[in-house]
């Protein structure tokens, strides 16, 4: 049975004026029309839910775990939450990430989330010839991103738009090679309604493709 995990990386989780949220809501409406009624869809809102960051508590916990030492209550709590996030991610086989573009990169909470799921021996492993992804079982990834500028004109802005490069590289590294991005871009320089309509068409096609794979 297919399980879809929505990863909402917008700081204003349910802001209906947000372009990326509008495009996501349109995608979800279309997607639900294509998939069976009993198919599971879960959602994690990174700016509402607890998503641990790598800080001194996490580093201390990892060091103690490696040495077989007892964790403090705080360390135990944070590592349990990180494990919950990891297992939720691993249990899905279709992913949808929703994000705005912030200073040419992903929102900070999405980076924290990536640090929770990129775990050796869980989503990748080390070998004598290099690291190998452990999620090579046909998983699919859709990224829905909104931006005021345009980043596909093969110019300076294309070079410094790191969010797409980072996400694609990291998920490919984990073994998720079916990766697609839908950009609602140019909202500050183009007709916003035209940008939305173009993105709506793209996510409708993406919804059909993901549901029928």
UniProtKB/Swiss-Prot annotation:
InterPro entries: Flavodoxin_fold (IPR003680), Flavoprotein-like_sf (IPR029039), FMN-dep_NADH:Q_OxRdtase_AzoR1 (IPR050104), NADH:quinone_OxRdtase_FMN_depd (IPR023048). Binds 1 FMN per subunit. Its EC number is 1.6.5.-, 1.7.1.17. The keyword Transcription regulation does not apply. One of its GO terms (molecular function) is oxidoreductase activity, acting on NAD(P)H, quinone or similar compound as acceptor. It holds the Pfam family Flavodoxin_2. It catalyses: 2 a quinone + NADH + H(+) = 2 a 1,4-benzosemiquinone + NAD(+); N,N-dimethyl-1,4-phenylenediamine + anthranilate + 2 NAD(+) = 2-(4-dimethylaminophenyl)diazenylbenzoate + 2 NADH + 2 H(+). This is FMN-dependent NADH:quinone oxidoreductase 1. It comes from Bacillus cereus (strain ZK / E33L).
